[in-house]
Amino acid sequence: MGLFGKKENTARTLPRHIAIVMDGNGRWAKKRGLPRSAGHVAGAKTFKTIARYCNKIGLEYLTVYAFSTENWKRPKEEVDGIMNLLRDYLKDAENFKDENIKVRFLGDRTPLADDIKALMLKNEDGSKDATGLNLNIAINYGGRDEIVHAVKKIIAAGIPESKITEQLISDNLYTAGMPDPDFIIRPSGEYRTSNY
């Protein structure tokens, strides 16, 4: 049986890379009269199900945009709740290595709490030899921020302006070596890419 109780048919060609903007959790909770935090918990649970299903059907790459650089502007209580949920998730994510899922985090880790950074590193190190799904989790990620990060890295390496190419910038992105997403899905139904 498939993810939604239907028989799986994976004989067709799969895309290589699907990206999901994990949004709409707060609106989902509000519609049900629940606190926003309940929406984030439900979203995290759904994410785990989706990641395992994508691994099962043989998808190569799944990227989830979990927390953008712009999300820091949300109320402190909500951000703290998301960070606590992230801690719990990262402790549980160690199970992914047993499922042959390779976990990688995208984004600027600098403003994150030390314990969260340590858990991220533990997950990456623990799953580095996995050969199944490449699961990219974007935390404190923004598309523009990623470009700035790449350019700063190039400048720090002392590469002259005349040697800077599109490929060089691409090679210095958080997403270096990955194919571009074939699909970007927003569960909220919005038709915008935000800062991803």
Predicted regions span which residues?
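Flexible, compositionally biased loop and terminal segments
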Residues: 1-196
